[in-house]
């Protein structure tokens, strides 16, 4: 049993080498390959999709964030396996791990903005003129990236203690006293951002569903098809958020406390470490699921993808072009929830 235990990357308690040096790196490798391929393809497709609507601008930002996040996985794999120079682990602690979180939370916030965008287009259509303009969306995108970098970059700068020996590197040991405090504070901030976005999406999509169902119940046209489509789109987004992000954000706070506070037992630290590692893997797997959401969420994405793959895409509701403007808004929004 002693041969299968090694010190974990974070802390002095032993961990199972089968989990930390084989299972987790192998799963990250699978996610890395799938994420690069799927997001590379998504980026290629979106290159041909004009940024004609605000939600498309937000989706393109998510593609960029997911692709950049995928590029950090090889460094985590090498660090967990203990391959390469010890400087690789230092790079993971100082740079690639921070970039991972930056891109993860950028992606989360943009999905929140998409929900906000859809809510105002469907439920509050009279207020959409400025909020849904392309220039506003691009400005908001710059603000999201800037604020996320502002919160996260100090974690790079304050991970500044020197490593003089090629020993097992522990990320928390590289942080200054201020770095430890900022690590804890930024973790709380990002967890708070996630829960705000998650609860907002529940509110937005509940209101959207009620509005769509009520509008089509009154018109009594294609109500079954609309219900199925809107339910599918809403379910796909909330499913990804719940499966990929909720477990990690439940585990994040107690794990951060176990890193920065001394009263946790070795066994507690070990359990929280495993929970954090596997829940973080679920969050990383989000880069493989987002392209599926693009397909359901964005009709221009579907059209370009099918055109590039020479697949015949069925046209739907061709006869609906004569509907009144209100019905057109509801139908379009059903395709792009």
From Swiss-Prot:
Entry-listed glycosylation sites: 2, 162
Lipid bilayer topology: Multi-pass membrane protein
Residue ranges crossing the lipid bilayer per the database entry: 29-49, 55-75, 96-116, 139-159, 188-208, 234-254, 278-298
PROSITE patterns: G_PROTEIN_RECEP_F1_2
GO molecular function, one term: G protein-coupled purinergic nucleotide receptor activity
GO biological process: G protein-coupled receptor signaling pathway
Chief location: membrane
PANTHER family associated with the record: P2Y PURINOCEPTOR 14 (PTHR24233:SF3), P2Y PURINOCEPTOR-RELATED G-PROTEIN COUPLED RECEPTOR (PTHR24233)
Protein name: P2Y purinoceptor 14
Source species of the chain: Bos taurus (Bovine)
